[in-house]
């Protein structure tokens, strides 16, 4: 096991995989860049029916403090994510550091631990439970950018193929 701190890229990939493993089957990490109205570039964001979840990766206290000055943090209604979390190694972000409404995830030995604010499965879609009213236009712009790239590469037509279901081999039905 490495004694080196987890990098920002590693945190973003872990966050994306964590979202996918927790019901957000459409998820992106920070290598995906898209235009959004207020310049927000998610470290990880996931979408499921009725909810979106943003995860911000923090590798240092200075990064945490700088993040607070961004326009979509000063005015949370400009930001993406019905639910918002910070992910870090223990000791970088603590519960008392969180802006109102945010939750906390820690990475320990390469695994994501739910520290604070992760809701039960049914709470994700209950409007009254959501801590934020996400900027749905920014989220739509983000998703449009992803779908447009798939279209430019000739893959968008595959959405009409339906869901792939496991079939026994040799069955042509």
What name fits each language-model region?
Residues 2-23, 96-173:
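Non-catalytic C-terminal interaction segments of nucleic acid-processing enzymes
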Residues 32, 45, 58:
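Anionic group-transfer/hydrolysis microenvironments
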Residues 37-39, 97:
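Short solvent-exposed loop/turn micro-motifs enriched in small/polar/acidic residues
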Residues 20-37:
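A short acidic/basic microdomain associated with nuclease active sites
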Residues 40-54:
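Active-site beta-strand-loop-beta-strand hairpin of nuclease catalytic cores
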């Amino acid at each position: 096991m490495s004694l080196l701190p987890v990098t920002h890229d590693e945190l973003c990939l872990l966050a994306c995989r964590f979202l996918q493993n927790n019901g957000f089957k459409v998820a992106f990490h920070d290598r995906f860049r898209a235009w959004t109205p207020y310049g927000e570039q998610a470290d990880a964001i996931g979408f499921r029916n009725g909810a979106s979840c943003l995860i911000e990766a923090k590798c240092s206290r200075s990064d945490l403090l700088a993040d607070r000055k961004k326009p979509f943090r000063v005015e949370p209604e400009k930001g993406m994510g019905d639910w918002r979390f910070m992910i870090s190694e223990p000791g970088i972000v603590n519960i008392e550091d969180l802006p109102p409404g945010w939750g906390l995830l820690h990475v320990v030995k390469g695994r994501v631990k739910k520290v604070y604010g992760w809701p039960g499965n049914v709470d994700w879609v209950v409007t009254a439970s959501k801590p934020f009213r996400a900027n749905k236009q920014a989220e739509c712009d983000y998703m449009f950018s992803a779908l447009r790239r798939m279209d430019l590469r000739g893959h968008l037509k595959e959405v009409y193929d339906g869901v792939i279901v496991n079939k026994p081999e040799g069955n042509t039905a």
